Amino acid sequence: MVYVQGGTLMQGSREVTLSDFELGKYPVTQALWEAVMGEGSNPSHFQGPRRPVERVSWYNVVAFCNRLNALVDINQVCYFSDDKCTQPYGLEGELSVAGSVHYKPTLGAFRLPTEAEWEYAAKGGKYQCEVEYAGSDRLRDVAWFTDNSSEESQPIGLLQPNALGLYDLCGNVYEWCWCDFEKKPPDTTTQNAIGVNKILKGGAWISYAKHCQISKYFSNNPFNRHYNYFGFRLARHFTL
């Protein structure tokens, strides 16, 4: 995990203030997915332990975060099926259960980044670099996209990082964010997921350059686990 000092971000005409947080240095790999979810659980089309996991839904990812947290400390579970936050989401059984997901801010808990956190980190955090892509204005230096990917995902960390040392933020796989597409500004605690698209950022191995720009976003159904270019990376609140 990479420390990201908080600050302010302009998203269009809206100023967002962010506290310190941490973001995964890389997208979550297939090796980490299997370590958490169990042997044989890897859903990815393009297989390889150091490739990003793909073909995961937003619901799958929320369940992964909770299971990872439970492995560390059951008290670090942060996603729940009820508004009183007493029923942890996705610790067992089917991973794509319909319903709302409620987030309880929990120090040290792994979670999905918000769209604002993702974009702020991609721009270099406090440095807010004036670049088109995460780390460069030249996309092929920092991202796997339609021009250089050989039409498949690639192992993590092979290209240049951005100013914070984060790899593959643009290209390789789209990354799920916590936020509902319809909520501006986003609700940070409750996600009524039925029929509400979620935001993905960064573009993918299949994307044209314009879709990999930091400012661009995509949205899709939270149940969708069929695309071999949907992945994610972890975030968490910063703790000393």
PLM regions: where:
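Cytochrome P450 core scaffold surrounding the K-helix E-X-X-R motif
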Residues: Q11-S13, A35, C177-T189
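Disulfide-stabilized, aromatic/cysteine-rich ligand-recognition loop
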Residues: Q160-N162, N192-L240
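Short, well-ordered surface patches within globular domains
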Residues: L9, G48-D141, W176
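A short glycine-rich, aromatic-capped structural motif
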Residues: M1-N42, P49-A70, C170-G171
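Conserved beta-strand positions that form and line the central face of beta-propeller blades
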Residues: Y3, T8, S44-H45, P52, ...
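Short, well-ordered junction/capping motifs at the entry into regular secondary structure
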Residues: S96-P105, D141-C170, N221-P222
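Structural recognition of the beta-strand scaffold that forms the well-ordered cores
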Residues: V2-Y3, E54, R111-P113, E119, ...
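Acidic glycine-/aspartate-rich tracts in secreted/extracellular proteins
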Residues: V28, E39-S41, N69, G124-Y127, ...
